[in-house]
């Protein structure tokens, strides 16, 4: 592994990142990730969800690569990967449909792993895990530190107390758990500090409010 690939990467100020990723988590925006030449997530055996409203993406993805998404309404589809775990739209290390890529790709941000402390030990995700370890958030003041601690507390709760929550509430994938922790972190805040008395029903309520009537675990 080259020194450049192991070098730390600036992830930005934590509160700034959290304010930007929030809308992406809720499906209301996209993530602005300084990927550089990294394409780890495109080579990590991810199934890519494409919603029926994503007409631009659907127009640029070969229909033969799409198949109905199990458990979702008609019109929701998935795109798979090749025998090496690579997205079929990845050509010579670059996304061939970048300007028209699906929402799943536009909202993916591997900094969620650095933010939450969630580790993806799936062997097919080693490239993503390696890249995620390089990110370093800037904590300029107490607000940054408290918010970061709240996000990590949410992630720890979803892992350590999953048995206290209804079955299937917590996603089975590391990406899903990390994203969910970001989405519900406010439940772990009170009076400018991290709570240590959060109850399961509060977490369930926060998850329900975040997901709405239908919100697929896209990764």
Predicted regions mapped to residue ranges:
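Short loop/turn segments that flank or connect secondary-structure elements
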Residues: 1-219
